[in-house]
Amino acid sequence: MSSTHQLVSSMISSSSSTFLAPSNFNLRTRNACLPMAKRVNTCKCVATPQEKIEYKTKVSRNSNMSKLQAGYLFPEIARRRSAHLLKYPDAQVISLGIGDTTEPIPEVITSAMAKKAHELSTIEGYSGYGAEQGAKPLRAAIAKTFYGGLGIGDDDVFVSDGAKCDISRLQVMFGSNVTIAVQDPSYPAYVDSSVIMGQTGQFNTDVQKYGNIEYMRCTPENGFFPDLSTVGRTDIIFFCSPNNPTGAAATREQLTQLVEFAKKNGSIIVYDSAYAMYMSDDNPRSIFEIPGAEEVAMETASFSKYAGFTGVRLGWTVIPKKLLYSDGFPVAKDFNRIICTCFNGASNISQAGALACLTPEGLEAMHKVIGFYKENTNIIIDTFTSLGYDVYGGKNAPYVWVHFPNQSSWDVFAEILEKTHVVTTPGSGFGPGGEGFVRVSAFGHRENILEACRRFKQLYK
């Protein structure tokens, strides 16, 4: 391996990593916030045409996998960042792309995990497999903290290793014969998991959409809430509020419309509330605040963006007892069977941390970290607003949605990366409705946020 390649390999790490600055940016040493300690080796994952295939099995590939377009959005961004570092090995790259938290987990939470880990080294404290649904005290704490007074019982809560994992488990439960609707733009895992499950048709490059998916267009003109009168009936409706990537939060009136729409069509809403604790106004933080939602909705959430658990992994899904299939069978019973078959329960160490999150001290600590990220969003919003751009989001979510009219999202992404060494996320990666937008994440150390904004001003002034 060449010395240059060794250097680059050592520099490609987490989204919060910083690198040595090019001279034209006049960056000070203090902006390099993190040590370059993680080494990542290159791994070939696909046979190239030049390689001779020695042997192949007789197993056919899942035809649905071939429908997927290129790579999943965030690994593709990481690939382009890596290529950029090969081109500019001395660049101080700042990542405001993937929504990965950067601030340390509060000590009140990590100390609980450390205590649990130590207990596992003792006869008295050791435990093996836990309940697949999660520890009873944690299920009770989640129900009380997030759903108190909403009719959600402890046994309606299923603890998991993250909301993204639960989305895939839900897709396995729903099977290949359901139809789905998604906000456009929306978190790409909804669509990609649907493609893998065989719920969709082929990808139409002319309109950048998959067949058999109802894309619910969300734009500045409609307040990022779809006109439901134009949306066809589907079995499943994926809905995220506050939304990733737009940052928009649905109002009580809008969610009431959504619940009524689902009831009229006999649909199930999969409500993603991963950013509910970022809400600054009085809009609903849970779909179950809407009367009747317990008959048509389930909710998935996570500690990832609240407590910095992106690596710790701990989330949950709520499925009320009143949510029934067309034959009257409870949806929760099928999900329970799925997790008992496909999952052995969340880590007991992670669950100890989650329980600490929901103590008064833990909640205070989480709100403090969330407040820090929201200050970052204000800095980003002020920057692009001062440059004359239309900016959305940020108030109720850690993402800022910036409009670059009449431009390709990937072109804007490439220009920003090339000229400022800042990684963002192209809006079109979230669906055709994201074309012409770029998502800027507020997850970052304050010095990096300020430096990135300085570079934005230098580029677009």
From Swiss-Prot:
* Pfam families xref list: Aminotran_1_2
Which prosthetic group or cofactor does it need? pyridoxal 5'-phosphate
- Tell me a GO biological process for this protein: systemic acquired resistance, salicylic acid mediated signaling pathway
User: What Gene Ontology cellular component terms go with this record?
Assistant: chloroplast; chloroplast stroma; plasma membrane
Where is this gene product found?
Answer: Plastid, Chloroplast
Q: Which residues carry this modification: N6-(pyridoxal phosphate)lysine?
A: 305
**Which SUPFAM superfamilies does this UniProt record tie to the protein?**
PLP-dependent transferases (SSF53383)
Q: Where is the transit peptide?
A: 1-45
Q: Offer an example of a GO molecular function term for this protein.
A: copper ion binding
Q: Which UniProt keywords apply?
A: Aminotransferase, Chloroplast, Plastid, Pyridoxal phosphate, Transferase, Transit peptide
Which top EC class is named for this enzyme in its record?
Answer: transferase
Temperature optimum or stability note: Optimum temperature is 36 degrees Celsius.
**Catalytic reaction equation(s):** (2S,6S)-2,6-diaminopimelate + 2-oxoglutarate = (S)-2,3,4,5-tetrahydrodipicolinate + L-glutamate + H2O + H(+)
Q: Which tissues carry this protein?
A: Highly expressed in seedlings, roots, stems, flowers and leaves. Lower expression in siliques.
Pathway per the UniProt entry: Amino-acid biosynthesis; L-lysine biosynthesis via DAP pathway; LL-2,6-diaminopimelate from (S)-tetrahydrodipicolinate (aminotransferase route): step 1/1
Q: Which domain of life is it from?
A: Eukaryota
Magnesium found in the keyword field = no
Q: Where does substrate bind?
A: 72, 99, 164, 187, 244, 344, 439
Q: For binding pyridoxal 5'-phosphate, which residues are annotated in this chain's numbering?
A: 129, 163-164, 187, 244, 275, 302-304, 313, 344
Supply the Gene3D superfamilies for this chain: Aspartate Aminotransferase, domain 1, Type I PLP-dependent aspartate aminotransferase-like (Major domain)
Q: Which family does it belong to?
A: Belongs to the class-I pyridoxal-phosphate-dependent aminotransferase family. LL-diaminopimelate aminotransferase subfamily.
Summarize subunit and interaction data from the UniProt record for this chain: Homodimer.
Any additional notes? Answer: The expected covalent binding of pyridoxal phosphate by Lys-305 has not been observed in the 3D-structure.
The name this protein carries in UniProt is: LL-diaminopimelate aminotransferase, chloroplastic
Instruction: Give the source species.
Output: Arabidopsis thaliana
